[in-house]
């Protein structure tokens, strides 16, 4: 057992230690709000080139670490990255987002989805994660991530981002057997992919079921929860010590169900008060979040006050400070810096405010 004080703060929080301040990182902390990222994007305009070339992905992952020293450094990648390795091709078009052609809508297409071999299909993952671990040492935890089965199925079936999810719901409610077959294959492949990330150096992994908030509770229980559980059970069987985070956008209606997924930490969006989230999830599930990314357009005093309010509600145990969603493009970089500086000084700020 490694001495606790030498472990990254984020791991200590995930294990339930009482800390003087919560660890902090931001979803999409490497991205368009940073000038260094925009400069690199101008030079390498293809998203897949940036995320699948080790040197570029390492550099991008480390940009916010060098600038702000967050307690977590997340792999720069995309939830769709492993899909081609299962026989589901995609591309990301600047300003349009992901395109998956042809969309998957028949039993024959689902039957053609095959097992993922991450070393072969995503060979860039190992050098990226190994290098990130070397670069950050114990100063931060390295996070891996993947998309959850429902959300990946939604992309594959819609063929692109959607506001209505009409195609996947059509399949769910008229031919559920086909959808369940796809969800099962995705769950097993995502478990393989997350275990591979852990083998390569990820110390914490987050499952993004970004679109599961679009489901009614009864449909969440049918199409989302069982497959989240299937992923987490397989990862826990191989890596019982690795903290698992589940994030859903618009999750207020299914919060308790998220706690049944097998995750250790529920990442909460800003529509739920953290005191309420604690009450609804119980003492054994950690919380991550949950500041509205729009707060970072406010004054620095406003940002500080919101951070203090959030941390007081969360308490000093099993909480990772984060936004409730990814940081927005156009966010002033100085305000992101202020967010991290405030978070890193919370022990003094909390003491001074009592």
UniProtKB/Swiss-Prot annotation:
Its EC number is 4.1.1.37. It catalyses: uroporphyrinogen III + 4 H(+) = coproporphyrinogen III + 4 CO2. GO terms for biological process: protoporphyrinogen IX biosynthetic process. Substrate binds at residues 28-32, 47, 78, 155, 210, 325. InterPro entries: UROD/MetE-like_sf, Uroporphyrinogen_deCO2ase_HemE, Uroporphyrinogen_deCOase. The record marks 78 as: Transition state stabilizer. It is found in: Cytoplasm. GO terms for molecular function: uroporphyrinogen decarboxylase activity. GO terms for cellular component: cytoplasm. Signal peptide: none annotated. Pathway: Porphyrin-containing compound metabolism; protoporphyrin-IX biosynthesis; coproporphyrinogen-III from 5-aminolevulinate: step 4/4. Keywords: Cytoplasm, Decarboxylase, Lyase, Porphyrin biosynthesis. Disulfide bonds: none annotated. The keyword Cell division does not apply. Catalyzes the decarboxylation of four acetate groups of uroporphyrinogen-III to yield coproporphyrinogen-III. Homodimer. This is Uroporphyrinogen decarboxylase. It comes from Synechococcus elongatus (strain ATCC 33912 / PCC 7942 / FACHB-805) (Anacystis nidulans R2).
